[in-house]
Each structure stands twice: as structure tokens, then as C-alpha cells.
Amino acid sequence: MKRIGILTSGGDAPGMNAAIRAVTKTAIHHGLEVFGIRYGFAGLVAGDFIPLTTENVDHKISEGGTFLYSARFPEFAQEEVQQKGVEQLKKHGIDAVIVIGGDGSYHGALALTRHGVNSVGLPGTIDNDIPYTDYTIGFDSACRTAMDAIDKIRDTASSHHRVFVVNVMGRECGDIAMRVGVASGADAIVIPERPYDVKEIAETIKRGFADGKDHGIIVLAEGVMDAEEFKDELLKYGDFDARANVLAHMQRGGSPTVEDRVNATKMGNYAVNLLLDGKGGLAVGMENGKLNTHDILDLFDSKHQGDFSLLDVNEEMTKD
């Protein structure tokens, strides 16, 4: 193996640049050439490759987003499109590829491996919804951004004795909502994985006001329902002022946290060493603080298990 490629695919996440940097510097240390593939699998098929050096990745560690850019490219599920991508890799002399992204990106990495190009997947998504890993690159930064926003929302909520339903990202995974909800002292956390009772949540809010509290915060995972709809349901059971706030894509931006920089660096370094050992079709993860690998194929038949103890802790402190 003399030359490897790296791409980012799907939604961007803080820490992706740190992973690209780690891959590049580790590979160069081992005498390999590194090419960045811009715009994900779309760029792979188009042959949009750029050489990466220590000099052009070193200052990227503190930057959010991905300087290789990203794009969703569902066409890569087609066999003939995959073959075009493989032909581009052969044309550029690239022997293996590291893919950073979510579950859709892993399908692409597996396809490349099946076509004879060893590929390793790194979990890059703020949603933290990848099986067999406790952590995905960007999750901690997204939580910090959401928590900072909710801290500011609380200021205005308190000024007006108002309730805010704050919608956070995560798709069908409630990990951001649970972590941010606990960190921001939410009165209720609502996630797709657990049943909820809007009337009971309204009673919790009313009880808080009766006890002298001057605001209410409900953290709502996006996979549950629209924030405005939830607010309207809530107001059926309570005579209080309420607003809905959707944090949306701001959670993907910003400089990555220490945790995201360190873990992305460890994962990028590990991925290169896997390729040097001739391994492919693997997904890198982290469980109990330690790096692991699983066959990518296993991920498609599994579901991420969140830390629901956070929800239990919050409910014990807020319910009667």
C-alpha cells in the first residue's frame, strides 16, 4: 500500500477536520501518500482528489465542518456508480480509503471493500446514533452548542416567566436531548426511544411555577415531533406562556471540543494502522473509552443503545 484516500460524507460534524489531520499525519509518518476526496462519494466518482500534506492539515484541528466538503450522494448505492468510483481510485493509484460519516457513509465504505479497495469507516455524526460505539465525532461539540443556546434561552424565559420547548437534533436518537437536558437542568426531556405523557409534563411545569420557579425548559429530540406541535399539545393542559425554539443546524457548527479533537485524532490514527495491517470493511468505534472495531455489515442489523440512565436521573429530580 502506497497511497490512501480520505473523504467525509453526509452531514458535517465538528472534529472531522481533526480526524483528517490525524489520518494524514499518521499515513505520512508511515511513508504513505494521502489524497483528500472532496464532496464525499460524489467527488470520488468525479475524481475530485487533492493531495494532503502535513502543512495543509496542521492548522485545521480547531476548525469546525470539513475542509474536504461533504455531500449526500444516494446514487452510490448503484453498482455501476460504485464501479466508476473504483475506477477513479485505480486511476489515481489509491489503494485504500478512510470514510468519515454516518450510517449511509458506511454503506459506501463497505461497497468499496467489496470491490477490492480496503476501506475503514469512522463515526462522524453529531447524532451519536451509530451501533457498537458510545461516541461519534461531533457529538460532544453539538451538545456544548445546544447547552450554550439553552443557557441563553433560559435567561429570556426567566425574564418573562415563560416555558420554552427546545428542539435539538439527533434524528431518531435521543442522545443529544438526554445529555443536554441533564446539563441544562431541563424540567423534561422527551426522546423517541421512551414513551412520554404531555399532561404529566405540563403538571411538572405547573408545579415548578407554584414552587416559585420563574421559567420552564423542555428539551425535545427532533425524532419525536415538531416543536410547535408539541408546544400546542402542552398548552392544552396548562395555562402558561410557551414558545418553541428549533436549534437546527447551528449544532453542527463551531470549533470542536477537547473531547472531539482528542477522540477524532485517536480514531484517525487507529484507522490508518488498520489499513497498514491489511484490514478493511471495518467500522471504528469507542466503548468504555477504548477504541474497537466491528465489521461494517454488523452495524446494519443493529441499533445504537443510548445511556437512558440520564433520563432516569432527570425524571427522579423533576417528578413528584
From Swiss-Prot:
Reactions catalysed according to its record: beta-D-fructose 6-phosphate + ATP = beta-D-fructose 1,6-bisphosphate + ADP + H(+)
Primary subcellular site in the record, as a coarse category: cytoplasm
Activity regulation field: Allosterically activated by ADP and other diphosphonucleosides, and allosterically inhibited by phosphoenolpyruvate.
EC number: 2.7.1.11
Residues the record lists as binding Mg(2+): 103
One example GO MF annotation: metal ion binding
InterPro entries referenced in this protein's UniProt entry, alphabetically: ATP_PFK, ATP_PFK_prok-type, PFKA_ATP_prok, Phosphofructokinase_CS, Phosphofructokinase_dom, PKF_sf
Quaternary assembly: Homotetramer.
Protein name: ATP-dependent 6-phosphofructokinase
